[in-house]
């Protein structure tokens, strides 16, 4: 391993560490955000249809995410994570998931004073708030009970 490899690894770890620390602070600050009421079966069904239309291209038809989703690309952006039980989506409060979907990752974090490169675009101009909540309800409906 030459000096440039060491520097590249150091830089990548620094970006992940600093971004992760900022993201953790943001998550803790939004942990008490209230969500919509318990979704009905029709809401979950609509959420599945919307997920397939707007989300599956990046997050996978089976919510599996993109390959090697824990490793940032050359641009410093992490691939789309899975939304099944193997990912980290279930760790986040509903309000965080809503903001990320509506505003996009970078904008949602920027509201909290966190600078972080995210490949997640915002869908607030394409989806209503109710539709975003239905997508979240669909994703959550696929998780094992212990992760809901």
Predicted regions mapped to residue ranges:
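Periplasmic/extracellular electron-transfer cofactor-ligation site
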Residues: 42, 48-79, 103-114, 141-148
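Electrostatic cytochrome c docking/interface patches
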Residues: 25-51
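General structural signal for secondary-structure boundaries
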Residues: 7, 40-43, 93, 128, ...
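Extracytoplasmic electron-transfer domains, predominantly the class I c-type cytochrome c fold
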Residues: 72-140
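N-terminal positive-inside, membrane-proximal cytosolic segments immediately preceding the first
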Residues: 1-8
């Amino acid at each position: 391993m030459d000096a440039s490899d060491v520097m590249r690894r150091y830089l990548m770890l620094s970006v992940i560490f600093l971004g992760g620390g900022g993201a953790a602070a943001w998550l803790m600050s939004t942990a008490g955000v209230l969500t919509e009421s318990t979704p009905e079966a029709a809401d979950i069904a609509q959420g599945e249809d919307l997920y397939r239309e707007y989300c599956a291209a990046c997050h996978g038809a089976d919510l599996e995410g993109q390959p090697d989703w824990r490793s940032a690309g050359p641009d410093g952006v992490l691939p789309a994570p899975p939304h099944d039980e193997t990912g980290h989506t279930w760790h986040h409060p509903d309000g965080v998931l809503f903001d990320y979907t509506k505003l996009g990752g970078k904008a949602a974090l920027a509201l909290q004073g966190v600078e972080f490169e995210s490949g997640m675009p915002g869908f607030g101009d394409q989806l209503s708030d109710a539709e975003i909540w239905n997508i979240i309800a669909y994703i959550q409906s696929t998780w094992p009970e212990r992760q809901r």
